[in-house]
C-alpha cells in the first residue's frame, strides 16, 4: 500500500543518513566527495595541496636553520682553537733562546774557515793565529749576518775570550749551531754528532752543537710548541669537516652553497654562501723546520721571533675572517627564522 511504501522510503532515507553520518564521524570530514558538495570538496583539495606544500617548505626551512646553526657553532669552536694557537705562538715568543759555553781546548792557530748558523742564518769566518783576531773575525761575521738576515741576533759580540785569554767563550741569546764537526773543533769546542735542532735554512743544516762545553736552551721548547701548533691546525680542519647537518657543510670549503626556498615556485629564496674555515682556507700553514727566508713552506720551528710574529699576524687575520663569516651566518639565520615564522602563520 501507499503507507507501507512511504514507510519503506523513510527507512531507506534514515539508513542513508546514518551511513553518511557514520562516514563523516569516521573520516572527520563533512564533505567526502565531489558528490557531497562540489564547491567545498575542490576548495578543500586545493587547501590540502597548499598545506602539503607549506609543510614541505617548512621542512626545508627547518633543515636550513639547523645547517646554519651547525656551521655557526663550528665557527665558534674554530675561533677558540685559533685563540689557543695564538697563545702557543705567544708562548714561543716568550721562550728565550741561548747558546753558552767555554771551549775546552784552544782554538786552531791555522787559517781555517768556520761554518755555523745563528737562528738558521748561515755564517762563515776565518780563524787566525791570533785568538783575539779570530774572535774579532767571528763577531764581524755575526754582525754582518745579523744586518742581512730577516731576524736580528741582538746587539754586542757573542764571541769573547775567557779570563786566561786562551779559550773562546760563546754567549748568545740565539740558537748557534755549527755546520760540521770540524768547524766546532776549530774553535776549541768539543765536537758532537748530536744536534740541538733540525733547523734548515737556505739548504744549510746544522749538524753539531751539543757537547760537554757547549749548551743551548729554548730550541727544544720552541720546537715542541711548533708541534702543538701543528696539531691544532689539524683539529681546525677536522672540526670544519664535522660541522655539517643532513649532509650539508657550510664551512668546510667554498662551492657548497645552500639555497633555501620560501615558496612553491622558488622565486622567493635565500642563497647561503659557504666558506672555507679549514686551516688552509684560513691561510694557516703548518710549522716545519725551514724558516721563511727559504722557498720551503714553514716558519722554522718558531726559532725566529720574526717568523713567530708572522704566524701571529696570520692568526689574527684568520680570526677576523671567522668573525666576518659568523656575522654573515647570523644575518642569514635571522632571515630564515623570520621566514619560518611567517610560513607557519
What are these regions (language model features)?
Residues 1-345:
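Primary detection of the long, small/polar-rich alpha-helical "axial" segments characteristic
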Amino acid at each position: 500500500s501507499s503507507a507501507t511504501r512511504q514507510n519503506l522510503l523513510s527507512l531507506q532515507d534514515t539508513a542513508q543518513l546514518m551511513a553518511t553520518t557514520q562516514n563523516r564521524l569516521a573520516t572527520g570530514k563533512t564533505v567526502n566527495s565531489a558528490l557531497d558538495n562540489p564547491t567545498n570538496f575542490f576548495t578543500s583539495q586545493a587547501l590540502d595541496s597548499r598545506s602539503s606544500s607549506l609543510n614541505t617548505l617548512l621542512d626545508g626551512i627547518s633543515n636550513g636553520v639547523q645547517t646554519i646553526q651547525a656551521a655557526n657553532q663550528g665557527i665558534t669552536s674554530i675561533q677558540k682553537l685559533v685563540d689557543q694557537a695564538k697563545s702557543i705562538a705567544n708562548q714561543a715568543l716568550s721562550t728565550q733562546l741561548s747558546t753558552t759555553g767555554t771551549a775546552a781546548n784552544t782554538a786552531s792557530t791555522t787559517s781555517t774557515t768556520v761554518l755555523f748558523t745563528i737562528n738558521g742564518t748561515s755564517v762563515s769566518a776565518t780563524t787566525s793565529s791570533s785568538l783575539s783576531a779570530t774572535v774579532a773575525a767571528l763577531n764581524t761575521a755575526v754582525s754582518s749576518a745579523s744586518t742581512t738576515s730577516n731576524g736580528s741576533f741582538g746587539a754586542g759580540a757573542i764571541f769573547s775570550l775567557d779570563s786566561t785569554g786562551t779559550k773562546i767563550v760563546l754567549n748568545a741569546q740565539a740558537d748557534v749551531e755549527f755546520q760540521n764537526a770540524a768547524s766546532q773543533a776549530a774553535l776549541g769546542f768539543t765536537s758532537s754528532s748530536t744536534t740541538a735542532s733540525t733547523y734548515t735554512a737556505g739548504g744549510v743544516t746544522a749538524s753539531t752543537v751539543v757537547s760537554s762545553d757547549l749548551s743551548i736552551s729554548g730550541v727544544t721548547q720552541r720546537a715542541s710548541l711548533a708541534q702543538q701548533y701543528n696539531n691544532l691546525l689539524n683539529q681546525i680542519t677536522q672540526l670544519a669537516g664535522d660541522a655539517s647537518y643532513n649532509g650539508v657543510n657550510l664551512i668546510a670549503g667554498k662551492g657548497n652553497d645552500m639555497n633555501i626556498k620560501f615558496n612553491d615556485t622558488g622565486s622567493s629564496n635565500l642563497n647561503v654562501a659557504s666558506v672555507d674555515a679549514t686551516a688552509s682556507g684560513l691561510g694557516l700553514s703548518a710549522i716545519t723546520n725551514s724558516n721563511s727566508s727559504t722557498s720551503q713552506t714553514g716558519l722554522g720551528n718558531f726559532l725566529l721571533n720574526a717568523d713567530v710574529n708572522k704566524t701571529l699576524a696570520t692568526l689574527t687575520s684568520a680570526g677576523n675572517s671567522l668573525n666576518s663569516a659568523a656575522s654573515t651566518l647570523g644575518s642569514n639565520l635571522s632571515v630564515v627564522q623570520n621566514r619560518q615564522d611567517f610560513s607557519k602563520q
